[in-house]
Amino acid sequence: MAKTNIKPIMPSLREKKRYLAFEAITNSQIDFKKAKEDISNAFIDLHGTLGTSKIAPMFLENKWNNASKTGIIKIGHKHVDDMKAAFAIAGSDKIIYKSLGVSGILKKAESKFIKKSG
């Protein structure tokens, strides 16, 4: 049987991505795993498992800054408001998650919203 190659999706048909910068406001130290778990659980509570799988948020671990407790999430452009809504119910009494801003370019989101330590 002949092997057929699947054509890649044209750029105009691909989902456009956005980079959402966020901050964890807390007095104690928080790591990437805890922040990802809190936000993911809130997102699942809000949109369900099926909604979360369709939206497919991607947490960028290498963009997490422990000193400023800030990070970046890659998400589709249609679902930015859904992610911001999940921030409202994420965390606990001692942790608040806040959206810092949205950008279409990762480098710009990092330079504009993520504070560098040192």
Regions found by a protein language model. Name each.
Residues M1-Q29:
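N-terminal, charge-rich interaction modules
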Residues E23, I72-K74, K98:
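Beta-strand cores of modular interaction/reader domains in eukaryotic scaffold and signaling proteins
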Residues K63-I72:
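The conserved glycine-aromatic submotif of the RRM
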Residues K17-Y19, T70, K94-I96:
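Broad gene-expression machinery/nucleic-acid interaction feature
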Residues A90-G118:
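Long, charge-dense
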Residues E23-K63, L106-A109, F113-S117:
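Surface-exposed, low-hydrophobicity interaction/linker segments
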Residues K74-D81:
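Helix N-cap motif at beta-to-alpha junctions
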Residues M83-A90:
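Short amphipathic alpha-helices in soluble, non-transmembrane regions
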